[in-house]
Structures are given as C-alpha cells and as structure tokens.
Amino acid sequence: DRDAQTLTDERNDQGDGNFRYEFETSNGIYTQKTGTPGSEGQSNYQGSFRFPLEDGTIAEVTYIADEYGFQPSSDLLPVGPPAPPHVQRLLEIAEDQRRQGITFD
C-alpha cells in the first residue's frame, strides 16, 4: 500500500542485549518485539505481528523465541491431532523420570 503512513516507529536498544521496538502503519500492519540476553548465551525474543487479510480479517501471531526455539501462537496455525492415550501416558512417564534426574544414554 503506497499510501500507508507510519503511525509508530519506536526503537530502544540498550546496547547490552536488551531491546524493544514497535512499528505500526495506517493500513493495519503492526509488529513489536522485546529482546533480552538468554541464560545459555542465546537471545530471547517475545513479540507479535499482525496484518489485514484480503477478506478484511486480521491475522495475528504472537511468539517466543528462546533456548527452546521459535514458539509461535495463532489461530491461523494448524494444530495436529491430540496424542493417543498410550502416547500421552508415555510422555507423562518420561516427564516424571526427567524430574527425578533419570537419564538414558
């Protein structure tokens, strides 16, 4: 959209790995992100973005990116079927073992 105007363009970088930015345009595009240094040397991000779809609805994604990877959340993202009961039980057992400090080579 050539006629879109920038409504917000804020950037704050503290120079130590901590930062925040926010950007918004008059045509409904918006993004914001906050970053912090991670405990394992990585950068941790938390943010969101949204934009209008052709049908007039708004697409929105929120996310976290940290030592566990990129973790998006949105009604637009596909969701797999639930794990069968026997798999769910195995996952619970594995989590119990992990909490007890049990490891396997």
Swiss-Prot record:
Q: List the disulfide bonds.
A: none
- GO terms assigned for molecular function: structural constituent of chitin-based larval cuticle
Query: Which keywords label this protein?
Result: Cuticle
- Region annotated Disordered, chain positions: 1-21
One Pfam family from the UniProt entry?
A: Chitin_bind_4
**Key word Thylakoid present in the record?**
no
GO cellular component terms, alphabetically, are:
chitin-based extracellular matrix
- In this chain the Chitin-binding type R&R domain maps to 16-81
- Let me know which tissues express this protein, per UniProt: Arthrodial membrane.
Entry keyword annotation includes Lipid metabolism: no
Instruction: State the name under which the record lists this protein.
Output: Cuticle protein AMP3
Species annotation: Homarus americanus (American lobster)
